[in-house]
Amino acid sequence: MLEGGKTMRIGVIGTGQIAHDNVRALLKTGRVEIAALCNRTREKAEAFADEYSLQVPVYTDYREMLACERLDAALINTPHGQHCRQFLDCCEAGLSIMVEKPLATSSADGLRMLRAAREAGVRAAVCHTQRYLAPMMALRAFLSGEEGRALGRLRHVSDTINLNYFHDQRPAWFFDPAQAGGGLLMTHGAHQIDRMHFLIGQPTDTLYAHLELMTAYSGLDGGYQLMGRCGEVTYLAQCAGYYLPQESALELTFERGSIRFSWKDNGVDRVGVWLGDGGQAYASLPCPFDMENTYVYQFDAMLDALEGKKNDAPTLEQATEVLLVLEAIRQSSDSGMAARVGTIPVD
């Protein structure tokens, strides 16, 4: 709710695949009104409205929607390469903004967006959804308690994502470097870097990386291997997008134990969190959160951010730090040497 008990009116920019998860979750929060929809193809926006019983105006030009509708906020669900321009126009319109990850396809654009939001005095948050996976929520809850603190200092993180990425059900824009900004590194590297930064509590300062470029898809990578450092904590991350079972797992090594995390059932791993404390086996930790509500948890946090309440939603600064890491990964892979990660200038 906004001041005076007013419900936040949201204009949705883009009604593609991810918009379904996002709008379904926003409606489930009971905290917003979807006030308008925009898609370049009118029929797709109209079909989207019908699916969710939304009796709202439909536009094919988001700028017209911003000018004609009395909105409080915008939700940007478009291909990565379109985020920056749309975000800047929403800032100019004075709207709060929720934008899909990655924030942009370059740190230069991320910094433009950050400065524009500051200058316009608007609030914004980024959909780095994996912070709100049920096992991640359980992991965070455990680490904030007495047992979690007893593990001592975090020393190392290992993070693996594998999946069959290059299939014909994936929207075509993912295979256009101008729209997607890259391959696995942009789509899943953004997830990995954000969740590791979030758990470690500070951004990457130095890294060494290798990108696997795809001959069949010019300008796209099919995976990467990465070693990084966040202050005194180190990490290893790897991702492959070949014909593989899906895997998404983390292991956090502390001074007095470790924690394993997985959010995919694949015949080897299963969804959950496990504690290893020096014994011969891992013990499963309770997970009172629901995987089906991942996006609801995310949007509750993001709406708190837009309403000026205490929250843990991904910020523009954090999302820009992710972009700086992705660029350093490319630099390291190209040079064959370690790379320092850029920082956000202090204005």
Ranges and model annotations:
Residues 1-4, 73-76, 301-347:
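C-terminal helix-rich "cap/oligomerization" subdomain common to oxidoreductases
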Residues 2-52, 303:
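N-terminal Rossmann-like dinucleotide-binding module
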Residues 56-116:
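Beta-loop-alpha module in the N-terminal Rossmann-like domain of NAD(P)-dependent dehydrogenases
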Residues 60, 99, 124-126, 261:
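Hydrophobic residues in well-ordered beta-strands that form the structural core
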